[in-house]
Amino acid sequence: MDVNKSFAYAIDNDDGKTFDNISSADVIILGPSRSGKTPLCYYLASLGLNAINIPLVPEVDQFDVIKDLDKSKMIGLIQDEEYLSKIRKERDKDLGITGVSNYSSLERVFYENEYAREIYSKLGIFVISMYGKSIEEVSSTIVRYLQN
């Protein structure tokens, strides 16, 4: 187990930047924007796992890219819509966006979560709700899942 290499892997493959190294992944995290993919991958890297994350955005159809990947390594994330909208509003503020943007609107978050659920259902993968759970708790669930 080389934690430094796992961190480098997580950073290099964050947010679906590239799929060149996906065959080296121990775990593939899917989810809407701001659902906790990146911090989860970094924590999994601290455990020595090569973790890649792929954002699910309805306007960017990733299904053809991910449908043939190893489903036993895939984890789908869902986050409570109101909580996710709140997090996105904070992100908007950090970016200097005032008012309600489409990105942070509750309607958009519901739409993205529904899209993610459809993808997870088509793939038949393990899904975890992030709501009210720590990164450590979710990581522990993932590690147990991967070991079975």
For each feature predicted by the language model, list its residue ranges:
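Hydrophobic/aromatic beta-strand patches that form the interior of the parallel beta-sheet core
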Residues: 52-54, 73-77, 126-128
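Internal active-site segments that recognize and position negatively charged phosphoryl groups
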Residues: 4-50
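Small-molecule kinase domains that catalyze NTP-dependent phosphoryl transfer to phosphate-bearing small molecules
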Residues: 4, 10-14, 97-138
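Short beta-strand-centered segment that lines the nucleotide-binding/catalytic pocket of NTP-utilizing
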Residues: 51-62
